[in-house]
Amino acid sequence: MPKIFLIKNRLHQQQQRLLESQNLLQHKNQDDERLVPPLSPSGSGSGPSPTPTSQPPPEPQGQGQQVLGQVPDSDQQPLSLTRKRFHHRRHYFGQSRHSLDHLNQNQSPNPNANANPNQIQNPAELEVECATGQVQNENFAAELLQRLTPNTATTAQNNIVNNLVNNSRAATSVLATKDCTIENSPISIPKNQRAEDEEEQEDQEKEKPAEREREKSDERTEQVEKEERVEREEEEDDEVDVGVEAPRPRFYNTGVVLTQAQRKEYPQEPKDLSLTIAKSSPASPHIHSDSESDSDSDGGCKLIVDEKPPLPVIKPLSLRLRSTPPPADQRPSPPPPRDPAPAVRCSVIQRAPQSQLPTSRAGFLLPPLDQLGPEQQEPIDYHVPKRRSPSYDSDEELNARRLERARQVREARRRSTILAARVLLAQSQRLNPRLVRSLPGILAAAAGHGRNSSSSSGAAGQGFQSSGFGSQNSGSGSSSGNQNAGSGAGSPGSGAGGGGGMGGGRDGRGNYGPNSPPTGALPPFYESLKSGQQSTASNNTGQSPGANHSHFNANPANFLQNAAAAAYIMSAGSGGGGCTGNGGGGASGPGGGPSANSGGGGGGGGGNGYINCGGVGGPNNSLDGNNLLNFASVSNYNESNSKFHNHHHHHQHNNNNNNNGGQTSMMGHPFYGGNPSAYGIILKDEPDIEYDEAKIDIGTFAQNIIQATMGSSGQFNASAYEDAIMSDLASSGQCPNGAVDPLQFTATLMLSSQTDHLLEQLSDAVDLSSFLQRSCVDDEESTSPRQDFELVSTPSLTPDSVTPVEQHNTNTTQLDVLHENLLTQLTHNIVRGGSNQQQQHHQQHGVQQQQQQQHSVQQQQQHNVQQQHGVQQQHVQQQPPPSYQHATRGLMMQQQPQHGGYQQQAAIMSQQQQQLLSQQQQQSHHQQQQQQQHAAAYQQHNIYAQQQQQQQQQHHQQQQQQQHHHFHHQQQQQPQPQSHHSHHHGHGHDNSNMSLPSPTAAAAAAAAAAAAAAAAAAHLQRPMSSSSSSGGTNSSNSSGGSSNSPLLDANAAAAAAAALLDTKPLIQSLGLPPDLQLEFVNGGHGIKNPLAVENAHGGHHRIRNIDCIDDLSKHGHHSQHQQQQGSPQQQNMQQSVQQQSVQQQQSLQQQQQQQHHQHHSNSSASSNASSHGSAEALCMGSSGGANEDSSSGNNKFVCRVCMKTFSLQRLLNRHMKCHSDIKRYLCTFCGKGFNDTFDLKRHTRTHTGVRPYKCNLCEKSFTQRCSLESHCQKVHSVQHQYAYKERRAKMYVCEECGHTTCEPEVHYLHLKNNHPFSPALLKFYDKRHFKFTNSQFANNLLGQLPMPVHN
């Protein structure tokens, strides 16, 4: 094969070089052949074809003609290529070789390749020779003619085939072809020979001059016989051409190739074909050669051969196999206009050769002809090349693998969603692949694509595989899962010899990334979300055979992703598994693709290891000088920092990480110092970062957790991988008091993700969830500001962007508390995989080492609770397996990175965790707050120094509270609502967050439930926490002492109790994480996508202006909105802070909101600033000015994706849904996603059979009023009474039974009496659902009970 490819390349070059000479020769040949009058059909066919033959043979000589074996010269050149084709072709032609000499010629050029065909053909050829020496001569002559013309070549083979089949026909056809060519131009033969000689000279690689001479001499000797049989041959030449003209397609002179391919189907009529092919011989030969030989190499005239050269080797094989032209007799020949003279000649020719050749070759060729018999397969051949064209390198196999992967991924996702809870419970010491599976499944669910949890975990407990990527996870080593994301879902195959495989998407995103979509597991929104970087992320070359090699698809766009992946891989490696991440391309910084070389047990300095992650066992893990990412590889430095690529944490970081179980002194980024994040130097892959975070989040964070848990519990590389954001924040505050200012971090987060990709990425709920999951990892060390920031910042600040420096927070006591809390947590976390993930993310985001230590401690205790300390981080990772929770949590929290709504939701969800971690979190939270303030301040200060200064100075505390709160909440809630919420609650901004849901007690309850439902991901988690761990809320209260936390407790508990009861089966069926709180729509037949949660609209709501934010707060967002608004301090602080850094920070928030679908968070004070930012970021495309314009209500609202303009923000918001692949609403029956309740209702009625609109004139009923009106107008000519665009009368339809009424009171009473558990009843206070005309009735309803918390 390689030789063939080389030959193809040579042939390409030679053919191109020969094109000019061949063109001249062909023109001459064409002229000469045209001059030959007797064989007008053959002449016309051969005339043009000889020129193509001259050209095409050089081009396809190795390919097409060698395949044909017709022209020795052509055979000589690309023999190797054509050999395979020819083998197939011959096997299909079944010994349909022209003559032994011709075969020998073919053999000499392709002795090996043609050996089999020749051997197969030898008996037939011997018989042919015995039967008639003329046949051999004719074969030689045919070969010469074939050299001269594709028709002759094809006819020669066809003649052989025909001779085998029918001696008379075959002989006549061969002779006819030769005779026709000779008669047409005996001179042309020499010219053709000359042309061939020239071609041979040019193509000296092919040593057939001697054979040509032989053929020439033989052909000349045979010319007399050919001339005698020219007339016979003419008819059968056409026939033969049709039957054997597969080589001709090579000649695209006539451009009839396709039609000829079609004719291939017909050629069974030999005589008709002979005439038709003679006339359209160039075309028909082109057809066959197209499918067989010329499909790869076009006719000499065209350079298509050059286009197809790589394919021909693979293609021709299958083409010939499938489309071996049946004998001319068997082929149905398209009846082209026959030349009467050629027909007569054909009849003459037929007489002599038919009698001679039929017996000898009929036996041999008939079976091959039978095989070729279904000539209708040739159209299949025509398509087969296309199939094969993708399979240059066994692409067919790859495609099959991809399909299989996609199928497996879907199944895995399905299973993973179901197994999400189990995974938490059954956390193995290895990263829980189920987490990865469930996350993609959740993400897929968020996309509304149904629960295809497609994560195949090569190493079930160990390989961390995000099903979303449809990646094949082949466990390499006990814990390593090498993941090749099918179709370029980045496959950071996680090879963790000792540390457990990191799974993965490129950037360790858990194989659920923008790259993943090709696998079919990912929802399409991923691709739309990815800023074009992820599809290429799959560029990542195959995984290294070594089980420890983790390949990340590294694209320049994937810097952060790859860096994050490398970082998490490195962290995984230091965690105890050698993980070698090979980032393809220069994705990761200086080294090209981030290659994470993590030696298991400390072995494994990266040869390529841009990131060298020493196994935990080997504290002295040498990082290559190139291992700029190594800093990330060390647990100290977030691999996301590898986005900086130059963070030297690699050397010291790795060594420190490995050496220092928990406290690795963090090396500053070579350029940005210890805390690049402090400078706002967040390597922002902006969209990539987020995708990377999503991918990294799952796979990386999980693997880091695993390795941290497995190898070095103290050195938790997950934090390094976890967030470059936290790393940056933490690194700026390397000290336990991370210098990162949470507010600044928020701004940084926002700013880093200012790009338009934010919306795309935000719509990528999975990324958010991964992001959140990743932040969740920091829960353990929520003291580190980057932990808290992680969630908020993850979208914009990828783990790469933020450099989580291992902050040596004084968390030992906290760790003890954490251990105790973890024991409690684990019971709940097992149920909600998110809490552990949050802890993991806290570890990652928090002071990396201390966070790692704490995290390891937490995980240890978690494992003690669930398994053992050895499983600590893995356990945490395995708890993340319900990554959907983290995805939703991360989405919700990221959506509200700056808003307490999600944070509270996550907090509620992680309240138990918060209880467990509350003391530690409180202790570390202040440290983190300081660190985050410093780090975030530094980051934003660097990125937006003035903004940061203003923010820091004016609202430094407020900002800390607000952003830190938001970040902490987001990260806490996302990473581990427990620790983050505890910390946040401990913080003043936590109080703000906690107060967010307390606009009103009832509203807070409703908001808590609504936020839980609206932010199904975060909220579902929160209600889970509230219900299963109401103490978590209490801990949040105790730690945060925030007013909201009690509200969250009561409300979330009530909402969770109410909603979770019904939603658990649904969540399971939809493959959502068990902790999710679902918000029902459409009478309970649809749910708000927990991952999209109002944030998944391509950012419409999260992008909403402040004006729109009010609407959002009114809507399902209102709960989160209220929560955020419930903390006016936060709003004021954020507003003031963001006003100070309005444009930039708003742009950050815009991006975050867009990315995180922060309409929930945007609905709060931050939504005032950031909502403007996000809305305008999307609308105006300019962060600051657009924000002002959008907020000012400019008439120009521009869609950043398609540049459409809208006069109203709501119109833009509605339009943005079109660009979001994460659907806002999911069908509870099938999980299909929709962005509009109108479409959801129309769809769900197909499940329920509700057809409320009945035609009074006939029996028909319809699901939509418009359908009924259209029906009445068209069928019954009944015109409706509504004017154009006039709003119809409100119709209340019971989605359960189809009961319809125009009275809201009747509808409500119907629901209450007949469907008392219908979620629609919970909307009675919503004027959109119940426009009560009777105010007294409405007041009575509202006065009966507190506002329903459900939605």
From Swiss-Prot:
Protein name per Swiss-Prot or TrEMBL: Transcriptional regulator ovo
Comp. bias regions, Acidic residues: 233-242
GO MF annotations in UniProt: DNA binding; DNA-binding transcription factor activity, RNA polymerase II-specific; RNA polymerase II cis-regulatory region sequence-specific DNA binding; sequence-specific DNA binding; sequence-specific double-stranded DNA binding; transcription coactivator binding; zinc ion binding
Organism this protein belongs to: Drosophila melanogaster
Domain notes: Only 3 of the 4 C2H2-type zinc-fingers are required for DNA-binding. Based on its marked lack of evolutionary conservation, the fourth zinc-finger is unlikely to be required.
Subcellular location: Cytoplasm; Nucleus
Single GO BP term: cuticle pattern formation
Amino acid composition bias (Polar residues), ranges on this chain: 530-552, 793-807
